[in-house]
Curated annotation (Swiss-Prot):
Family designation: Belongs to the myozenin family.
Phosphothreonine found at: 107, 111
InterPro entries in the cross-refs: MYOZ
Protein name according to UniProt: Myozenin-2
Skewed-composition ranges (Pro residues): 106-120
Primary role: Myozenins may serve as intracellular binding proteins involved in linking Z line proteins such as alpha-actinin, gamma-filamin, TCAP/telethonin, LDB3/ZASP and localizing calcineurin signaling to the sarcomere. Plays an important role in the modulation of calcineurin signaling. May play a role in myofibrillogenesis.
Species of the source: Homo sapiens (Human)
Length: 264
């Protein structure tokens, strides 16, 4: 009787034989698909679907860029022809590469020779020179619009009264009437006796004031008006005292020493 291990091996061999027949003999194992997707693959997969708005905008932009992209098919065809001719003539050979000699890269056609002086016809074909015969444009001239005059204005152009009625004007201020020349005593202060008797110079005396020193108690009272205010929070003081410091003695009141008499 076969053991359990041999039976499992036979079943595995049968399963592998069936898988080879289904997928072919070249396949060694099962294709389990992609295990990990990088962010770039995920982004390209999302842009390939047209379900979201961003993918549609990306496709429109790609089509627009392809529309305005210029591809030089003529240059590519010429390069292929030159390469095929070189292959036929035997110019391209592997022995040159083995010897260490390297060929110069093929230059595109219609490339001017850098050793020769530049020719304007090669750089820009069709350019013959500056346009000296054509006068330059006048950019600084100001275009004045044409004035339009309606038929009504043409009909009443000869009548100034109708023109004034058509275009109302602002009212002009009326001229001020001449006021009588009255003398005013309100604006100028006239001294007693007139200006002749008044002194020509106005004398001003600076008032005398006493400067207080910084150490003066009166100055300190101005700086800190609460300095002379009585405080009941820290040290108890009497009601009659004038902020006189109270001296508290620390000596004991009871005398512990007993006096001795002459008899003892």
């Amino acid at each position: 009787m076969l053991s359990h291990n041999t039976m499992m091996k036979q079943r595995k061999q049968q399963a592998t034989a069936i898988m080879k027949e289904v997928h072919g003999n070249d396949v060694d194992g099962m294709d389990l698909g992609k295990k990990v997707s990088i962010p770039r693959d995920i982004m390209l997969e999302e842009l390939s679907h047209l379900s979201n708005r961003g993918a549609r905008l990306f496709k429109m932009r790609q089509r627009r860029s392809d529309k305005y992209t210029f591809e030089n098919f003529q240059y590519q065809s010429r390069a292929q022809i030159n390469h095929s001719i070189a292959m036929q003539n035997g110019k391209v050979d592997g022995s040159n590469l083995e010897g260490g000699s390297q060929q110069a890269p093929l230059t595109p056609p219609n490339t001017p020779d850098p050793r020769s002086p530049p020719n304007p016809d090669n750089i820009a074909p069709g350019y013959s020179g500056p346009l000296k015969e054509i006068p330059p444009e006048k950019f600084n001239t100001t275009a004045v619009p044409k004035y339009y005059q309606s038929p009504w204005e043409q009909a009443i152009s000869n009548d100034p009264e109708l023109l004034e009625a058509l275009y109302p004007k602002l009212f002009k201020p009326e001229g001020k009437a001449e006021l009588p020349d009255y003398r005013s005593f309100n604006r100028v202060a006239t001294p007693f006796g007139g200006f002749e008797k008044a002194s020509r110079m106005v004398k001003f005396k600076v008032p005398d004031f006493e400067l207080l020193l910084l150490t003066d108690p009166r100055f300190m009272s101005f700086v800190n008006p609460l300095s002379g205010r009585r405080s009941f929070n820290r040290t108890p003081k009497g009601w009659i005292s004038e902020n006189i410091p109270i001296v508290i003695t620390t000596e004991p009141t009871d005398d512990t020493t007993v006096p001795e008499s002459e008899d003892l």
